[in-house]
Amino acid sequence: MQIIFIADFFADEILGGGELNNEVLADSLRRRGHTVVEQKSSHITSEYITEHWDYNFIVGNFVHLPEEIKRSLASFSYIIYEHDHKYLRNRNPAFFSGYVAPPSEIINEEFYKNALGIFCQSDFHYKILHSNLSLDNIKNVAGNAWSDESLEHIAALSSEKKQNGFSILDSNISHKNTLGAARYCESLNAPYEFVSSRNYHDFLKKLAKNDKFVFLPQTPETLSRVAVEARMLGMQVHTNSRVGAASEKWFSLKGVELIEKMRLRREEIVDSIESIFTTGRCSHFTPKRELPKISILTSLYKGDEHIDGFMRNMVRQSVFDDCELIIVDANSPGDEKAV
């Protein structure tokens, strides 16, 4: 199988959760004998897509993907490996009640609709996406991908003695809420350390120094790779309701148990990618969201005389197929009960 993996950035440029996950997926597909070519979204042209007509496409982060390419891909086999909320103008569902945005805030809808599948990372993630887009091609992969090397490194760190205190992700991204996490620790009079490093394994070592991790994001996290890493390291995780990983049953696991769960999950995700490109469909998609009916409540006056004309006018309404008609007995003159 030949695959082109499109993303805004890759792990050699940015040490982000999405980029690390994508790197492991690409390597896992290669180990199974597939050809995987990584291409930055800003470098993709219509000519490039046409020249690679016999390839399948995985689209990761696509902020820099030109609109014409999104339209061109409709003629090809592609999946969207969703890392945040790029179906919203502001990419932050927290701005809207119940995480459901008004139609005017929805973007890229056709791009999502035309994909063979949209891979979400947690139950929390896919429920938000599903409630905003009326699509039936959404799948929850319920996890992330780590290399065997990283999992072995995490396993070794998990057995090391930890000090009493909190680790805090040191991020300059405002919605990661680093300062809010620090204030939380201060409110508990608890010691804390900011954790950062451009070297992934060094970052994990620093993270694992303490027995607790606090993360209080201000926007819904599709999973939060670092929260899962903290659990694999055997740490307590203090968080809020905006972390997708916490919606998964396996989040109650920690240490080696969770490490082995994620090792298996990586292979299951790769299985799903192979399956969807081979068959054109994938199991365990969410059902299409059923939009609520419009309820029309009315009463009748002399219903036995006027019902025919009333119903003729009613069924001619353009949206009547999506309506339910409720007739209330108002005890008006005429044989209402017969009607």
Located regions from the model:
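Conserved catalytic-core segment of nucleotide-activated headgroup transferases in glycan assembly
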Residues: A145-F203
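N-terminal pre-catalytic "stem/leader" segment of glycosyltransferase-like enzymes
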Residues: M1-H64, A74, H238-R266, E274-G280
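Short, well-formed alpha-helical segments that are part of the catalytic scaffolds
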Residues: G303-R316
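Cell-envelope/extracellular polymer assembly enzymes that use nucleotide-activated donors
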Residues: P292-S295, E324
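Nucleotide-sugar-dependent
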Residues: F215-V226, S241-R242, A246-E248
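Extended catalytic core of nucleotide-activated donor transferases of GT-like folds
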Residues: Q39-L116, F124
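A conserved acidic beta->alpha catalytic loop
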Residues: D329-A338
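A short, active-site helix/loop in glycosyltransferases that binds the activated sugar's phosphate group
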Residues: K113-N137, N177
